[in-house]
Amino acid sequence: MNISNNAGIDSNDLAKRGESLIRKSTNRYLTTVRIAFRAKQRRFDDFDGLLEESTIKPVQRSIIELSDEQDQPDLLPG
């Protein structure tokens, strides 16, 4: 089953990113909470109209963002 075929997100890639987040974490529970918290923030941003890209579900977007932050820390500001 493809999670979001119409949005252009590969479900296999999303699953690998999620597994990578869990595997590289020291605490699986805190990683899950971070994903959920980020998804909740994105959901409210969608309601407020702050994000243009609403075809991706908030949980999917948060997994992608956290995975990118983990794999490419040099992209973070500061």
Swiss-Prot record:
Biological processes annotated in GO: DNA-templated transcription
* MF-aspect GO terms: DNA binding; DNA-directed RNA polymerase activity
Q: Name one GO cellular component term.
A: DNA-directed RNA polymerase complex
- Coiled coil ranges (UniProt) are none
- Enumerate the Pfam families for this protein: RNA_pol_Rpb6
Q: What is this enzyme's EC?
A: 2.7.7.6
Task: Indicate the enzyme's highest-level EC class.
Answer: transferase
InterPro entries given in the database record: DNA-dir_RNA_pol_omega, Pol_omega/Rpo6/RPB6
Q: Which UniProt keywords apply?
A: DNA-directed RNA polymerase, Nucleotidyltransferase, Transcription, Transferase
Instruction: Give the signal peptide as a residue range, or say none if absent.
Output: none
User: What does it catalyze?
Assistant: RNA(n) + a ribonucleoside 5'-triphosphate = RNA(n+1) + diphosphate
- Membership in a protein family: Belongs to the RNA polymerase subunit omega family.
Q: How does it assemble?
A: In cyanobacteria the RNAP catalytic core is composed of 2 alpha, 1 beta, 1 beta', 1 gamma and 1 omega subunit. When a sigma factor is associated with the core the holoenzyme is formed, which can initiate transcription.
Function according to Swiss-Prot or TrEMBL: Promotes RNA polymerase assembly. Latches the N- and C-terminal regions of the beta' subunit thereby facilitating its interaction with the beta and alpha subunits.
Q: What is this protein called?
A: DNA-directed RNA polymerase subunit omega
Q: What is the lineage of its organism?
A: Bacteria, Bacillati, Cyanobacteriota, Cyanophyceae, Synechococcales
